[in-house]
């Protein structure tokens, strides 16, 4: 067991980690959505990450004691991931690691639910803004991905790439299924499949030109 003394979480620590999950999920999503650049500039996104890390750090060590072996393991893995992230100039894995260690002896369902709600909200906002921008013909170039010698045009729904939108949508479907796994029915899976197919065919824009 990583704990020397397993102390129950108080309400303050729960709120800390909830806020951290919201901030880090928000950062990971908006960094892939160019239409949010005017609302969440890069400096603001960096502030979100730093605040998220601080809150998780406070959450992990508040009124808890860990074994030396556990602390050394966490430091080594964190250092390795930080070095890798710096070399790759991509902090997704490092952020995911922080979120993972924060869930130790924590309600995983609560974490998944928060990520699901934040992701779904951001996706809805991105879809709405991108469709509005397309309709009023404002910066359409950031909404359309052109491939195969301009023969394939795909609507990004505000994301940096249509495949990124598909990944987030797939993650939402998986989280939805996991959250309702105790009462999962065939029509839930059918609904998720329908949503995936609907957006897959909707993003192809040949018919809009």
Show which residues each predicted segment covers.
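Hydrophobic transmembrane helix bundles of membrane-integrated enzymes that assemble
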Residues: 2, 8-29, 34, 44-209
């Amino acid at each position: 067991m990583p704990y020397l003394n397993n102390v129950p979480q108080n309400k303050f620590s729960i709120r800390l980690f909830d806020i951290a999950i919201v901030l880090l999920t928000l950062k990971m999503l908006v960094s892939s959505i160019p239409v949010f650049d005017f609302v969440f500039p890069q400096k603001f996104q960096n502030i979100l990450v730093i605040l998220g890390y601080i809150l998780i750090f406070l959450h992990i060590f508040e009124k808890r004691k860990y074994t030396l072996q556990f602390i050394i393991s966490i430091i080594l893995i964190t250092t390795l991931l930080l070095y890798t992230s710096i070399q790759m100039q991509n902090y997704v894995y490092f952020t995911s690691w922080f979120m993972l260690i924060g869930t130790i002896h924590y309600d995983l369902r609560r974490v998944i639910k928060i990520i699901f709600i934040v992701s779904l909200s951001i996706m809805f906002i991105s879809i709405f803004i991108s469709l509005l921008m397309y309709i009023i013909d404002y910066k359409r170039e950031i909404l359309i991905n052109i491939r195969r010698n301009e023969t394939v045009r795909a609507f990004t729904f505000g994301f940096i790439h249509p495949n990124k939108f598909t990944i987030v949508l797939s993650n939402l479907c998986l989280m939805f299924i996991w959250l309702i796994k105790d009462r999962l029915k065939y029509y839930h899976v059918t609904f998720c499949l329908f949503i995936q197919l609907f957006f897959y065919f909707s993003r192809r824009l040949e018919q809009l030109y």
